[in-house]
Swiss-Prot record:
It comes from Synechococcus elongatus (strain ATCC 33912 / PCC 7942 / FACHB-805) (Anacystis nidulans R2). The keyword Lipid metabolism does not apply. Its EC number is 2.1.2.11. Its main location: cytoplasm. This is 3-methyl-2-oxobutanoate hydroxymethyltransferase. The gene is panB. Belongs to the PanB family. Binds 1 Mg(2+) ion per subunit. Keywords: Cytoplasm, Magnesium, Metal-binding, Pantothenate biosynthesis, Transferase. Mg(2+) binds at D44, D83, E115. InterPro entries: Pantoate_hydroxy_MeTrfase, Pyrv/PenolPyrv_kinase-like_dom, Pyrv_kinase-like_dom_sf. It comes from the Bacteria.
């Protein structure tokens, strides 16, 4: 059964944890969907893990559309949420509506995710919801603000914690159906989760959120360096490297396929 934003709210009320991961292509998306993942985020992190950029900032709306279309072909049941890339929504609510509308028209994403909780963004969230576009919020560490805030944990002072709490409450009031809490203290995430009626999805925010999300490349150990809050369940980078090296060695030593029976008669 296809999952919708309404299911996430029901699960929060029932105390059922929400399981989310990121995807950037058909192969990963189909594996996640078959494994029963609830929410697949086509995150702008794909700029780094799939396209090799040092940050998420270079990603374009056209890039996002391309990858969402690949992901949707692999998902039958998971809720697909797409990030809106940097500067596709920050300039004005009208630009945000056009960007989100274009993305949802040509893909099967059911919602978009926006970073931050400043007043102008709250107006944008409200306007998007008014025209029928579901919005997921994102507070704490916001990668699109990396040049201003860096990648360090957010909410380390009482004032910063209050600001993040206020942003989360304001995003709920503006109509967001869920909020990602990234790299903030566990206690702050638990407090926000208790105060909101919409689900919180944590990444580096402790165990007390309504759900959890990781970048799948981190989960699988594909990235050269691991974020401090992201456990690797495999070392797939090493496994792939070993397989490729073995293949290369067999080809160079003329051992590749030598153990296979001949399938063709020699030419006369």
């Amino acid at each position: 059964m296809p999952i919708t934003p309404r299911h996430l709210r029901q699960w929060k009320q029932q105390g059922r944890p929400i399981v989310a991961l990121t995807a950037w292509d058909f192969a990963i998306a189909s594996i996640l969907d078959e494994a029963g993942i609830d929410l697949v985020l086509v995150g702008d992190s794909l700029a780094m893990v799939a396209l090799g950029h040092p940050t998420t900032l270079p990603l374009s709306l056209e890039d996002m559309i391309h990858h969402v279309q690949a992901v949707q072909r692999g998902c039958r049941n998971a809720l697909i949420v797409s990030d809106l890339p940097f500067l596709s929504y920050q300039t004005s609510p009208e630009d945000a509506i056009l960007a989100a509308g274009q993305l949802l028209k040509v893909t099967e994403a059911q919602a978009v995710k926006l970073e931050g909780g400043y007043p102008r963004l709250l107006e944008t969230v409200q306007r998007l919801v008014e025209v029928g576009i579901p919005v997921m919020g994102h507070v704490g560490l916001t990668p699109q603000s990396v040049r201003q805030l860096g990648y360090r944990q957010q909410g380390q002072t009482p004032e910063a914690q209050q600001q993040i709490l206020d942003q989360a409450l304001a995003l709920e009031a503006a109509g967001a159906f869920a909020i990602v809490l990234e790299h903030i203290p566990d206690r702050l995430a638990a407090m926000i989760t208790a105060k909101l009626s919409i689900p919180t999805i944590g990444i580096g925010a402790g165990p007390n959120c309504d759900g959890q999300i990781l970048v799948t490349a981190d989960l699988l150990g594909l990235t050269p360096s691991q974020p401090p809050f992201a456990p690797a369940y495999l070392n797939l980078r090493q496994a792939i490297g070993s397989a490729v090296q073995r293949y290369a060695r067999e080809v160079r030593d003329r051992q590749f396929l030598q153990s296979q029976p001949a399938e063709q008669e020699p030419l006369s």
